[in-house]
Amino acid sequence: SVLGGFLLSNERREKQALREQPRELSQKLGQAIDGIASTSPLTVVDVGAQSLEDEDHVYAPMLAHTKGRVIGFEPLEHRRREREANERNIDLSLRPTLIGDGRSYTFHINNIDATSSLLPFNRDIVDDLNDHRTLETVATETVVTTTLDEAISDVSRVDFLKLDIQGFAYPALANAASVLSRTLVVHCEVEFLPFYLGQALFSDVDPLLRANGFRFVDFSRLSRSAFRSGPPASRDQLGWAEAVYFKEADTITNPSWILIQAFIAVTIYGKLSLARHLIGEYDRRSGTSYESLFDD
């Protein structure tokens, strides 16, 4: 009887509708975007573009519903080859460039290569946390970084900018003012602890993006770890997250860019109220009635 009450409740029906609506809206908005010549294809810039075994690329749902291309930056050659071999079905361009501030650094290649960084580990932090204490650097090489402004100066609009570069997001963003001026959504790994020596934290990245016209929307993922002393299941320390920022609509002059933001909001993040808010602004500027899609 209790189970039946839950399954037949209005609350469950409403939640089921919330799960189904993003798929339908994604398809319809994707078709709308494909129909606007100036917006298609959408452009994803992926800084730190290697594939991870246990998860899809965060922007994969976006590419499933509209025409798009991915420009990726991944310094490890075997990871570039691996992704190119596995993703022949998308418009993918992978580059070996290390994105940063244009200066030379020592690139630290680690035993888990997804943690490789232009910065060395901060052993005082890493050794204290159960999930991180086995990390170590196995090789180093001297590299020269390139700024995002230089690397994609020919890209007229970045619809989705994703950064996962292990403590180096702040220098990359601080030297990307031109790119940020034409970027609609930023999805950025940020840290709350200095896992790497000399790195900036979320408290540094957040005001930088706000100063460039972005609004913090949410964390799409939060990662916590247990202290080495245990117990391992007691994951008490928040270490890092993936932060989501949308360009403030009142700073966007092209209304179709707001339609793209709404598409990303619902397709990648399932944020229906944000999407409807943005669609309302798009309709107001363009004289359309896409907001009615939310009433179906």
Please identify what each model-predicted range represents:
Residues S1-G4:
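Long, low-complexity intrinsically disordered regions enriched in Ser/Thr/Asp/Glu with frequent Gly/Pro
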Residues F6, N10-D296:
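Phosphate/nucleotide-binding beta-alpha loop and adjacent structural elements of enzyme active sites
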